[in-house]
Amino acid sequence: MNELSIAYGLLKDLQHESEKHGVSRVSRVHVRIGRLCTIVPEVLTFAFETASEGTVAEGAELSIAVVPARGRCDKCNIDFDVETDTSVFFCPQCGGVAAEVISGRELEIALFRGTSETTS
């Protein structure tokens, strides 16, 4: 299950960022995942819930935005949506092979919210 290792990676990043910003409890995490990453959002959500037990993010709400796959043609210089069921992306205008994938490979924590403990 690739999603479980991704969940552990996200939790490692959350732990680091929480310590850096004085956050003791993460309540919400928003993740951006590119369509080309072949991650199943529901499986990642389950993996995150399981892996987060006993961590700063235990019980946190995970929301996932899937970023569309887009390519850029170096001949026409246009951006276009690409099909994710193929490994070669063709320009819809000239038929050329897309020289660059400009979105769809993202895997990032876009934001997280949490609270910090205060001592009296």
Question: What are the residue ranges of the model-derived segments?
Answer:
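Long, charged N-terminal interaction/targeting segments
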Residues: 1-63
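Long, charge-rich boundary regions
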Residues: 2-4, 105-120
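Cys/His-enriched microdomains
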Residues: 71, 89, 107
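Short Cys/His-rich "knuckle" micro-motifs
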Residues: 83-86, 101-105
